[in-house]
Curated annotation (Swiss-Prot):
It comes from the Bacteria. Part of an ATP-driven transport system CT_415/CT_416/CT_417 for a metal. Probably responsible for energy coupling to the transport system. The lineage of its organism: Bacteria, Pseudomonadati, Chlamydiota, Chlamydiia, Chlamydiales. It holds the Pfam family ABC_tran. ATP binds at G39, P40, N41, G42, G43, G44, K45, T46. InterPro entries: AAA+_ATPase, ABC_transporter-like_ATP-bd, ABC_transporter-like_CS, Metal_Ion_Import_ABC, P-loop_NTPase. It is a peripheral membrane protein. Keywords: ATP-binding, Cell inner membrane, Cell membrane, Membrane, Nucleotide-binding, Transport. This is Probable metal transport system ATP-binding protein CT_416. Residues 5-236 form the ABC transporter domain. One of its GO terms (cellular component) is ATP-binding cassette (ABC) transporter complex. Belongs to the ABC transporter superfamily. It is found in: Cell inner membrane. One of its GO terms (molecular function) is ATP binding.
Amino acid sequence: MTKQMLLENVSFRYGKTGPLIVDHVSCEVYSGDFIGIIGPNGGGKTTLTQLMLGLLQPVCGSISTYSVQDHRPLSIGWVPQHFSYDAAFPITVKETVLSGRLATLPWYGRYTQEDHEAAEEALLTVDLIDYKDSCFSHLSGGQIQRVLLARALAARPEFLLLDEPTANIDPVNQQKILQILSALNKHCTILMITHDLHHTAGCFNRVFFMNKTLTTLADTTTISERFCCNTFGRCP
């Protein structure tokens, strides 16, 4: 297995004197992992992923990333929990997915043929290619979540971070997203925050329980809400 991310004694707080939100967390993530991140609200799960993305900087400790592609930085895709948009803005599904390619635009700022091909490939992956010309705001909540996943996939990442991608959507789209992620895991490392242990625990090869500190649970077959409450005193 190839190491893709290493966290060593990472801590984070907001402000100079605030309490630690992430408290001396250490872990390793390997190529091909499908890791669930569980824990109570306020336990630091989202903050941990923002540190992994480089959106926040730790007050101590270090985060190292390693690409399986020589001489390139690790490419990370990100699917946030909350996504705000103006429902009156007439953007199509494909245009939304294309925005995931903004970081790769050439100096003249126009999407290339490769960008369009990557966007359509991502829409095929999430089974929404027939909606590419539809207005984004006309989609259901579950379809929107799949479009956001496609937007992350458009950049063809090696490593995918998701913050509760199956929360507050219908069961059909929940199952669809989990099937898509399981297929993607054949060539993409995945870390996913979730509260839905009943449907998701079987997807993971490891689980991180995050409540300011981090505990790694290797046997995912025994993980349940009751297990977490009994073991850690807090429920996810």
